[in-house]
Amino acid sequence: MQTDRPKPDSPKRKHRWYQFSLRALLIVTMVVAVGSGWLGRKIERKRIERDAIAGIEALGGSVWYDYQQGQFSEPSGPGWLRGLLGDDFFGEVVKAHLVGNMIGDAGLANVKGLPRLETLELSGAYVNEAGVAKIKDLTELESLDLSTTNVTDVELANIKDLPRLRSLDLSSTNVTDPGLANLKGLNQLRVLKLKYTKVTDAGVKGLQQALPACRIDR
């Protein structure tokens, strides 16, 4: 009795399977490469962030993560993975508090390692142009407190391009009318405090015309 034998795959079928396997391998390789590249970049960014936080805390400052600001007390992400990579890997530092005369220009250099910062409090800090220059790259910044510092008109040039800034406290600083010209482009500014400065009524009026939606306290 003659039995049917399975027919071997045709060359065309083998070729199609080979093409599919090669294509799938290439896709998987690309996904792994992209994923590992992203992971590597984030690990490096978090390393820089941790160094910045250590520098801030060494000067008596404090930082807060985004998940500490809202209703959640811990970051998103599975617990086992947070245990492996750390809670901070799944959060962003959004607030930094560096007040008092222990904070100088060198200490302020740490904020460059916190690119997602939204609130920065520097009341009483001993900062000059070199220190304030570190702030200009914090494009996510929404609230900045420079009260009771030795900030002058010169330093204001370093904050004129912060696109999201909504609150700025310059109380008890050496700011004068000419320096206010640097603030006229801050279209998102809603609160500006100028108490105990040398700013005049004329200076406030000129700035108010440029920023009609901003409340200026003087």
Regions found by a protein language model. Give the residues of each.
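Stable alpha-helical elements in mature extracytoplasmic
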Residues: 48-52, 107, 131, 155, ...
